[in-house]
Design a protein with these regions (language model features):
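Phosphate/pyrophosphate-binding active-site segments
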Residues: 2-6, 140, 293-394, 521-522, ...
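Active-site diphosphate/adenylate-binding microenvironment
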Residues: 15, 30-33, 38-40, 350-427, ...
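Thiamine diphosphate
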Residues: 103, 111-118, 264-267, 307-309, ...
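Glycine-rich, acidic loop regions that bind phosphate or pyrophosphate groups
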Residues: 104-145, 243-348
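Conformationally flexible catalytic loops at phosphate/diphosphate-handling active centers
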Residues: 148, 152-209, 358-361
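Active-site nucleophile and cofactor-binding loops and adjacent substrate-binding regions
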Residues: 30-32, 50-60, 75-82, 137-138, ...
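Glycine-rich phosphate/diphosphate-binding loops that line cofactor/substrate pockets in enzymes
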Residues: 13-24, 64-70, 94, 152-156, ...
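A short, small-residue-rich loop immediately preceding and capping a beta-strand
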Residues: 19, 25-29, 48-50, 68-107, ...
Length: 560
C-alpha cells in the first residue's frame, strides 16, 4: 500500500472510491500489471477482489451479479488479451440488457502508438457492444468518468459500459482537492417513465373488453423489479400469462394464470396480445407467430425495440412496473365486457397445456438408459425449492429444461439471454452464490457448455461456494449435431461436434468438490440430494441419450 496522504490520491484509488460510491461490493478480475493500483484502492475501500481464471468468466460474473441483485456489476481486466478475452461477456450483457462496467488496462499515455505491452484499440472494439466506451485521459478525472460510465449503464434500457485506463493515469497521484468523486444521487436523474397516459388508457380499455387476451412477461419485468405490478395486473384482469428469459418465475407454478406450454396456441387465437419487456427476436419467431387478427401491444424501455420486426397496434415506451401499475389502475372498477367470458379461455388454454404435458409424459417418466433429457430435467424441477436459483448453460439440454423447469420465485431463473452464449454457467453460479449466499444454486450444463469455463469450478472451491451442478453428458454438441444430420445426412452428422466421454464427476473431485456419476434415471434424485448435503461445489455427471433432441432444436429455422 502506498503512503498516500490526505492531500494526494492515485488514479487507482480514485477509481475504487468511485466504485464504492456507486455501491459496488466486489469486482471480478484476472490480475495484470496494468491494473494493480485499482486492487490496492479496492482493499482500502472494502471492495472484495474476486480473482478468476479467465477474463470471460470475470465479465460473465459481473453480468450475473447485476442480474441477481439489480446492483452494478463490475469486472476489471488487464490490457490487450485481458480485454479481448472479456469481449464475449460484455457482448452477452449487451444483448441481455444487463448493466455492468468493464474496466480495462492500457499502456501508458506517454507510450501511445509506440507498441507498448498489450497495446490494442480497446475502445474501438468495445464501442459496438456497449452503451458507453471511453479512455480516461487524466488522473483527476478518473472517478468522474466512472460516474459517466454508470450513468449510461442505467439510462433507458440498461447495458454495459467500458472504460480504458492507461497505466500512468492509474499510477499517478494528484491533489485530492482536484479529484471529484461524484455521488450517484448528485448526478443521476431518474429516467423511469410510466408511458404515455393516452396509450395507457387505451391499453386498459383493450384489456377490459378483450375476450381472449394473453400477456408475455419478458426479462424487463425482472430487471425493472416489476413483479408485483405484473402479478397484480394479471390477477386483477384475469389474463393468462406466459414468461420468458428473466421474466420466468414472475408467477409461481400452480397459479391459475401461469401458463408455459401453450404459448403458440394462445398467440394464434388471442384477440389482444401484450408483449412486455422482450423483443420480437428469434425466440418469438420475429413476431410472425402472433395471430394476424390480434391487437398487438408492446411495452419496452427502448423505443427502438417497439415494433421492430413486426407491426404493432399500440406501443408504449416505459418502465414495465410503472406502466403495468398504471394500466391496472386505469382498468379497475370497469371490469366488464370480455372479462366475464375469460373462464372459458383460461380453461381452453389449460386443456392445451395438459395435452402438451401428456405428449411429453412418456419421456418425463422414462426409465431408459441412456437417460432421456426430459427425465433429467423433470427430476431437476422436482428437486428445486422456493430458495433455488436455477441456471441453464447449454444448447439442446437447456432447451429441454425450458419446457419443464419452473422457478418458484422471480429472479430465480438465469440463462445467457438472446446472444445464446455458452459458458455462462460457472460464472453465473459464482455471482449468484456470492450475491445471495442464503439461496441454493442449481445449475444444469451441457457437456459442451461446461467445457468453455469449467476450470473456474476451482474458483468456486477456493471461495467455498457450494452449489448443485448437473452435466447432461451426451459427448456431443448435440444441438449442432442435429442440424448437420438434418441438412447433410447421418454420414456427416458428427463433423466438428463430437466430444470425448469425459467423467466430469471426477473432474469435480480432482478440484476438491463433490462428484457423482449417474446412468440409471432412478438414481438422479438421490444423487442430487447427496450433492446438496455435501456442502461443496458439485457436479453430477448424467449420461443422457445422444439421439434425443429437444422440439425447440428441431424447429429451428436454420436447420430447415
Amino acid at each position: 500500500m502506498p503512503d498516500d496522504t490526505q492531500d494526494v490520491i492515485s488514479g487507482g484509488h480514485l477509481v475504487a472510491k468511485a466504485l464504492k460510491a456507486e455501491g459496488v461490493e466486489r469486482i471480478y478480475t484476472l490480475c495484470g500489471g496494468h491494473i494493480i493500483d485499482i486492487y490496492d484502492g479496492c482493499v482500502d475501500e472494502g471492495i472484495e477482489v474476486v480473482d478468476v481464471r479467465h477474463e470471460q468468466v470475470a465479465a460473465h460474473a459481473a453480468d450475473g451479479y447485476a442480474r441477481v441483485t439489480g446492483k452494478p456489476g463490475c469486472a476489471v481486466v488487464t490490457a490487450g488479451p485481458g480485454t479481448t478475452d472479456a469481449v464475449t461477456g460484455v457482448a452477452n450483457a449487451f444483448r441481455a440488457e444487463s448493466p455492468l462496467l468493464l474496466i480495462g488496462g492500457q499502456g501508458a499515455l506517454t507510450q501511445h502508438k509506440m507498441g507498448s505491452l498489450q497495446d490494442l484499440p480497446h475502445v474501438d472494439m468495445m464501442t459496438p457492444i456497449t452503451k458507453f466506451a471511453a479512455t480516461v485521459p487524466d488522473t483527476a478525472r478518473a472517478a468522474d468518468m466512472v460516474s459517466m460510465a454508470f450513468r449510461e449503464c442505467y439510462h433507458g434500457a440498461p447495458g454495459p459500459s467500458f472504460l480504458e485506463i492507461p497505466r500512468d493515469v492509474l499510477d499517478a497521484r494528484v491533489p485530492a482537492a482536484k479529484a471529484r468523486v461524484p455521488r450517484p444521487g448528485g448526478y443521476r436523474a431518474s429516467t423511469r417513465s410510466a408511458g404515455d397516459p393516452e396509450a395507457v388508457e387505451k391499453l386498459a380499455d383493450l384489456l377490459v373488453h378483450a375476450e381472449k387476451p394473453a400477456i408475455l412477461l419478458g426479462s424487463q419485468v425482472w430487471t425493472t423489479r416489476a413483479t408485483e405490478a405484473a402479478v397484480e395486473l394479471v390477477r386483477t384482469l384475469n389474463i393468462p400469462a406466459y414468461m420468458n428469459g428473466a421474466g420466468r418465475g414472475t408467477l409461481p407454478p400452480g397459479d391459475p394464470h401461469h401458463f408455459q406450454l401453450s404459448r403458440r396456441y394462445a398467440f394464434s387465437g388471442a384477440d389482444v396480445i401484450v408483449i412486455v419487456g422482450t423483443p420480437f427476436d428469434f425466440r418469438m419467431g420475429y413476431g410472425k407467430r402472433l395471430s394476424p387478427d390480434a391487437t398487438v401491444v408492446q411495452i419496452d424501455l427502448d423505443y427502438r425495440t417497439v415494433g421492430k420486426n413486426r407491426d404493432i397496434d399500440l406501443g408504449i415506451v416505459g418502465d414495465a412496473g410503472l406502466v403495468l401499475k398504471a394500466v391496472t389502475e386505469a382498468a379497475s372498477g370497469r371490469l366488464n365486457g370480455g372479462a366475464s367470458k375469460r373462464k372459458e379461455w383460461l380453461d381452453e388454454l389449460r386443456a392445451a397445456e395438459q395435452t402438451a404435458i401428456e405428449k411429453r409424459l412418456p419421456h418425463l417418466r422414462s426409465d431408459a438408459s441412456p437417460i432421456h433429457p426430459y427425465r433429467l430435467v423433470s427430476e431437476i424441477n422436482d428437486f428445486l425449492t422456493e430458495d433455488s436459483i436455477y441456471i441453464g448453460d447449454g444448447g439442446d439440454i437447456v432447451t429441454f429444461s425450458g419446457q419443464v423447469v419452473q422457478p418458484k420465485a422471480p429472479g430465480h431463473w438465469m440463462d445467457p439471454g438472446p446472444l445464446g452464449t455458452l459458458g455462462v454457467g460457472i460464472p453465473f453460479v459464482l455471482a449468484a452464490k456470492q450475491a445471495r449466499p442464503d439461496k441454493e444454486v442449481v445449475a444444469l450444463f451441457g457437456d459442451g457448455a461446461f467445457s468453455l469455463t469449467g476450470w473456474d469450478f476451482e474458483t468456486l472451491v477456493r471461495y467455498d461456494l457450494p452449489f448443485v451442478g448437473i452435466v447432461g453428458n451426451n459427448s456431443s454438441m448435440n444441438q449442432i449435431r442435429y442440424g448437420q444430420k438434418a441438412k447433410y445426412g447421418e454420414a456427416r452428422e458428427r463433423v466438428g461436434n463430437t466430444l470425448g466421454d469425459v467423467h466430469y464427476d471426477r473432474f469435480a473431485q480432482m478440484l476438491g468438490g463433490y462428484g457423482e456419476e449417474v446412468r440409471d434415471p432412478a438414481d438422479i434424485g438421490p444423487a442430487l440430494r447427496r450433492a446438496r448435503e455435501s456442502g461443496k461445489p458439485s457436479l453430477i455427471n448424467v449420461w443422457v441419450d445422444p439421439d434425443a433432441y429437444a422440439p425447440g432444436t428441431m424447429n429451428q429455422t436454420m436447420y430447415k
